[in-house]
Every structure is written in C-alpha cells, then in structure tokens.
Amino acid sequence: RFMARLLSYFIRQEGKEQVNVLVATSGDTGSAVANGFLGVDGIHVYVLYPKGKVSKIQESQFTTLGKNITAIEVDGVFDDCQALVKCAFIDEELNNHMKLTSANSINVARFLPQAFYYFNAYARMEKLGLADNLVMCVPSGNFGNITAGLFGHKMGLPIKRFIAANNVNDIFYKYLQSGKYEPKPSKQTLANAMDVGDPSNFARIYDLYCGDHDKITSYISGATYTDNQI
C-alpha cells in the first residue's frame, strides 16, 4: 500500500493520466499487489501468474477483483512470467506507449520500504531485552525480502546474521556452498511462493558485497527443505 500511494502521488505531481504496473507472481506477491493497488486512481495493474502453479486461494485473491486489476495466466513457470516482465521493460517503444513500472522487487520502491519492518522488529526485540546476537530467518524465493534486510544491515541495523530458507529450488543455497551461481528451471513445490529458479535479487546481494563470496557467507547462511520436511 505504501508503494501504491507513493506512485499515485507522483502520477498526480507529474500530471500523468495513467501508469501501468506489471507484476509477476508465484502466489503471494500477486495477492498483496492486487489488494494494495485496488481502486488507486491513475494506475492499472497486470498480474502475470503461472498456470496451475498457484493455490486456488491465491488465484482467487487477484483474479476476482476486477476494476483496475487484470490477471494474465501464463503457460509456464514463475521464471517465465518474470522474464516477460523484464522483456517489457527493455522494450523502449512499449515503455513510452504504456508508461510501465513494476511492483516486483526489481523496483526499488517495492523492496526498500520492506527494510522498515526489520528495524521495527529489532526495536521490539530490544524492548524485550532479546536483541543481542539477533538472527533473522527469511523464507526466500525471489530474495526481495532478505535483500531489504541486508540493505537495512548496511544502513546500520545491528542484526548478527541472516538465514535464507529455500525449498528444493535451492540455487542460492548451492551458491553459498560452492561460490557458483547456477540458475535452473524452477520446480513446483508445496511452498509455491518460493518456486523461483533464477532469483532476480541475487544480483543486488552480489553487488552489495562486491561479489565477495566469503563476505556474503559471513552474513548469510542457507537452509533448504523438501516438501516432506515442509
């Protein structure tokens, strides 16, 4: 909602008639974005989601709203949806015609505000006297959430470490072990919101620590779980 209101404000300030928001989802993001932007003047949202790979509840949360929310089912996986969104943004003619932006974490206006609740969580734990050596465990798919926490850490948030929790789409977990980043087609799991085979925020994490694998592993450890474990 913060991003929706912020975008609406700048649309009014710049005198634009309408901005079109593209968002790829593996489940949770589509629901959150659709409800956050529902009815916001000057914005139309297009939610791209993989056919048969989101839960019925999640699907109903962004396909039944109408108004300024349009859902587009894609015959593929989340990574295909994300690739379509990225292709749209590098098409200059399409951008000029449709005035595109994104509500995925490829847009810094999406993930930077997420850093706020890491500070809030730390403040609450400090009040309870439990903030020493605080470790944050973050379920991770496209890695926007944990990247926001790492940005907060760079801003001075005194969190000791982060744990990136993956399902069997464990590309980042394997990177932590080997130092090699090898994207793969995503596999469908019970934790479908984390079914990402090429997390777009890996590049931000990599750049944040200047590609230093030792430094990355000193702040982030990984965990991976099968459907049976979940």
Label the model's feature ranges.
Residues 1-230:
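PLP-dependent amino-acid enzyme catalytic core
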